[in-house]
Amino acid sequence: MYAIIQAGGAGTRLKTISGDLPKVMVEICGKPILEWQIESLKKSGIHDFLVIISKNGKPISDYCGDGKKFGVNISYIVEESPLGTAGGLYFAQDIIKDDFVLCFGDLMLDVDWTRFHHFHKEKGAALTAFAHPNSHPFDSDLLVANEEEKIIKIDSKNNVRDYYYQNLTNAGLYICSKEVLDFVASPTKIDFEKVVLKHFIEEGKAYAYRSSEYVKDCGTPDRFYSVENDLKNGIIHGKSLANPQKCIFLDRDGTINKYNGLVTKPDELELMDDTSSAIKKINASKYLAICITNQPVIARGDVTLEELKNIHNKMETLLGKEGAYLDGLYFCPHHPDKGFEGEVPEFKIECDCRKPRIGLLKKAEARYNIDLNKSWFIGDTDRDIQTGINAGCRTIFLDTTPNPPIRFKDAKPDFVCHSLSEAVNLILNSERDNHD
């Protein structure tokens, strides 16, 4: 598989750091951004590269040459005049005959490309966008995807958002089929997102690959220094799903949001006072933050799947406004007890995903390459504790809910805490102590 790297940017926002160098040549910890990208792609077996450069891109071709010093093959497309983020793809049509990676040159990243490509093939997509939550969704363009992860539309950051939304942003990284190259019919100035991505969304052929991996734009001085710090601390490479991940699994009701009985509409969901600050600490650590929740309101017929999605969108919106996000959210819609008025028969079943069974954790384990034995489960009921025990996680019981029912009397947590912040601090401090 080929990788195309868009390296034509002048890096004007980075001039105080880069001087006159193209931005892909700015060094982070001794290597240009472009070299870090090539190394990440090479680890997944990608050895053929097309680098799109401007007529001022000689420093790039001088440094990289034919790629042999990196153990890869590099060819160049030189744009005599700027062709936007997609126009240069026209010149790749006779070279690339199959799927390819498209990567923009100001991204610092480390991705398991094999896993990404498998998702693309499994979906039968023409175009798959790498998508992830971020700490500022309120001023970001968002991808709106359905349950099959097909992209329905782009929610522009310029929209007046008087609604709740899922925190899912486009990272500027794609796997594309040859069909994408064929769509670029002439070497004219074309915007990839506004024209190419939009077309394949309308055709129903674009998908969102949600990942927790590190992909960040380092095109401004503040972002550059933040990325440099993350690289020094091992966060960038550690987040690659080629490596086993550690996770803090979180129950929802009574852990993330205040316990108010069964939540059947967005107005009834209210975050705990310390939720956002606690989850922000997880986001800044080497742990993932994933919510695991039983939602029998679906089986009871109290809410539809679409209504539950809007409840969860409210949760993500509130977290995002405070700079926090969940890497993933898994819910069980089932309940085994039958024979009640208004129930939905298809969800009134025995399943493997209703806590304390661990089907949801196994889904997260497979998607995010999670090492359950190095992970934690935090919740406010003995059902949560039993779930963590069943999965091989360490557990923390939150005594945030008055008089919780006792269903699993033998479920003994490793620790008891009075708030989510206390629990997260305990985990992260123990992590630091183990490394001292």
What are the roles of these predicted feature ranges?
Residues 376-415:
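Acidic, Mg2+-coordinating phosphoryl-transfer loop and its flanking beta/alpha structural elements
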Residues 1-19, 243-253:
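N-terminal nucleotide-binding beta1-loop-alpha1 segment
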Residues 2-5, 27, 31-105, 113-115:
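Conserved N-terminal catalytic core of the sugar/cofactor nucleotidyltransferase
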Residues 52, 275, 279-315, 325-339, ...:
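Substrate-recognition element of Asp-dependent hydrolases with the DxDx(T/V) motif
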Residues 101, 344-346, 352-385:
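Conserved Lys-Pro-Asp/Glu-containing loop-to-beta segment of HAD-superfamily phosphomonoesterases
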Residues 100-101, 108, 114-121, 134-137, ...:
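Catalytic-core segments of class I nucleotidyltransferases/pyrophosphorylases
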